């Protein structure tokens, strides 16, 4: 009897040891979310949060299906639209073990986080911010973007303006932007591309977001009856700028084009309809007819809650790439994950999609390089780790809703 008990105990102990060993071999990954819950781009926070959660849940399911020993969880923090708060948020997520950080949406926040936290620790950042100012720092290969940078968005805005006006040649575009890196860089790139096409530029008119009113700037923007307005702003300040433009009595929103920070599914109630109805704009596009998008959208609709928002597919892709890189590295070490991003986005390697994510995980687990194509499309990272793909939506606000008119390749 005692011998039987000892045998049973030994067997149980052996099973426990085997279980612990198997558990120890599993890569436990933490993906951090730097969310704009409050601040000038708070409209983006809920959809980014949801996108990363869905990516983590789906990747975990596919890893289990593939028999690959990796599981992930997501943790989040509010960056508050402020670089100092963003650094504190990033530190808290890294302290919780985050190997990758998805977000933030504002470039000065990303720069502060990189300089203050992530470069030293080799933690990968996947920001939603598009400003080229991000590439003025030496990030040691730790900052990847799945969103097209503003060097490409400027070309998209030019194409959208030509689509509206028929030509750029001789046409006057009045450029007005919020005084911060996103506005400054995009205005500069647009102006250069517009004049290269034979167009003329008025301004740019620059405004401080802390101003109480923008009547003076609005008057400057509408002077000389321009053929088009190029407005680069955030929702909180456009509520005031838009009202000031309407007060001039000269502003026609159907002549205006905006960039991605003013792209939202439903127009916020504090923006006057007369300031936005009929306005067009550009944002990074997602090919909605693909099987990958159908899976993504099905997950989104099943989860309920917030509607799709600009760049939610890009945040989903960022989390998926972090997961794949960790699987390829067989490690959640931030440096190892960072070093394997290009191993899962290798041009010329076998292509995998969201529809074949389980197979992709098997491939990287066996040491193969792959070219993962995201929901938002291919990445084909340049030397500076920005995507070279350039699909953009051209949209128009109709009865308070964003309606996509067409999709374009900004480089053509």
Identify the role of each PLM range.
Residues 7-17:
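Hydrophobic helical h-region of N-terminal Sec-dependent signal peptides
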Residues 2-9, 24-412:
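Extracytosolic ligand-binding ectodomains
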Residues 17-24:
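Sec/Tat signal peptide C-region and signal peptidase I cleavage site
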């Amino acid at each position: 009897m005692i011998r039987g008990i000892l045998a049973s105990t030994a067997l149980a102990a052996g099973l426990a040891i085997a279980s612990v060993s198997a558990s120890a071999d599993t890569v436990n990954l933490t993906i951090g979310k730097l969310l704009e819950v409050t601040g000038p781009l708070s409209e983006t926070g809920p959809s980014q949060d949801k996108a990363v959660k869905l990516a983590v849940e789906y990747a975990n399911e596919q890893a289990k299906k593939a028999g690959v020993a990796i599981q992930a969880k997501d943790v989040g923090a509010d960056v508050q639209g402020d670089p100092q708060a963003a650094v504190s948020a990033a530190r808290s997520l890294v302290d919780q073990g985050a190997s990758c950080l998805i977000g933030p949406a504002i470039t000065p926040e990303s720069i502060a986080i990189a300089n203050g936290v992530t470069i030293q620790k080799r933690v990968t950042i996947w920001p939603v911010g598009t400003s080229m100012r991000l590439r003025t720092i030496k990030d040691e290969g730790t900052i990847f973007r799945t969103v097209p940078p503003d060097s490409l968005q400027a070309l998209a805005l030019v194409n959208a303006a030509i689509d509206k006006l028929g030509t750029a040649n001789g046409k006057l575009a009045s450029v007005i932007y919020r005084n911060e890196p996103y506005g400054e860089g995009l205005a500069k790139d647009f102006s250069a591309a517009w004049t290269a096409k034979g167009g003329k530029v008025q301004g740019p008119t620059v405004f401080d977001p802390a101003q109480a009113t923008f009547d003076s700037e609005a008057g400057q923007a509408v002077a000389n009856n321009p053929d088009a307005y190029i407005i680069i702003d955030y929702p909180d300040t456009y509520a005031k700028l838009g009202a000031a433009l309407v007060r001039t009595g000269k502003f026609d929103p159907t002549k205006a084009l905006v960039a991605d920070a003013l792209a939202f599914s439903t127009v916020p109630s504090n923006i006057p309809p007369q300031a936005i109805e009929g306005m067009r704009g550009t944002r990074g596009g997602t090919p909605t007819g693909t099987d990958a998008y159908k899976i993504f959208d099905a997950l989104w609709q099943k989860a309920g809650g917030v509607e799709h928002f600009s760049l939610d597919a890009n945040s989903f892709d960022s989390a998926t790439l972090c997961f794949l890189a960790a699987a390829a590295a067989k490690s959640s070490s931030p440096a190892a994950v960072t070093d394997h991003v290009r191993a899962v986005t290798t041009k010329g390697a076998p292509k995998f999609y969201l529809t074949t994510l389980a197979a992709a995980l098997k491939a990287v687990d066996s040491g193969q390089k792959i070219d993962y194509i995201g929901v938002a499309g291919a990445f084909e990272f340049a030397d500076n780790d920005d995507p070279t793909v350039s699909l953009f939506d051209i949209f128009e606000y109709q009865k308070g809703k964003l309606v996509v008119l067409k999709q374009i390749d900004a480089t053509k």
